[in-house]
């Protein structure tokens, strides 16, 4: 199964949260195909005052994912989502790009913030800590 992993889960892994550690181990072992959006990559790298050792560990961790850049199709999809959901549901541009990444790649979105995404048609957003993956 292809899954786009949201920032919150990566942060949990770095903090040693058991569910996140288990999930990323499944990706590393190939049980799940892990994708990461450019937005998540940016959010992770924006952590303040990261030591060289921590930065090295983060880069190694991010290496288990297939990186999904924001290409034209993703940008167009995100724009359509914003047009449809920004006013009615408060969809933020970064969340629109993450949702678009999942939709364009026909992947499930793994996030701890399902409320940010549950209303988007054609997107499956799951809290992997609550679900049997």
Segments predicted by a language model, with ranges:
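A general structural signal for well-ordered alpha-helical segments in protein cores
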Residues: 20, 41, 55-58, 75-78, ...
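Alpha-helix/helix-capping structural signal
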Residues: 8-9, 39, 73, 115
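Acidic, PIN/NYN-like endoribonuclease modules and their adjacent C-terminal/linker elements
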Residues: 1-2, 104-133
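Short, structured coil segments at secondary-structure junctions
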Residues: 61-63, 120-121
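Nucleotide phosphate-binding site architecture
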Residues: 10-11, 42-45, 118, 126
């Amino acid at each position: 199964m292809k899954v786009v992993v949201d920032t919150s889960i990566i942060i949990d892994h770095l903090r040693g949260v058991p569910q996140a550690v288990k999930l990323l181990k499944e990706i590393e072992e190939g049980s799940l195909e892990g994708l990461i959006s450019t937005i998540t990559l940016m959010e992770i790298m924006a952590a303040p005052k990261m030591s060289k050792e921590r930065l090295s560990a983060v880069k190694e961790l991010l290496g288990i994912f297939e990186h999904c850049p924001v290409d034209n199709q993703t940008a167009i999809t995100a724009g359509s989502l914003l047009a449809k959901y920004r006013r009615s549901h408060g969809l933020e541009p970064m969340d629109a790009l993450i949702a678009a990444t999942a939709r364009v790649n026909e992947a499930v979105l793994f996030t701890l913030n399902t409320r940010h995404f549950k209303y988007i048609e054609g997107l499956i957003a799951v809290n992997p800590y609550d679900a049997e993956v």
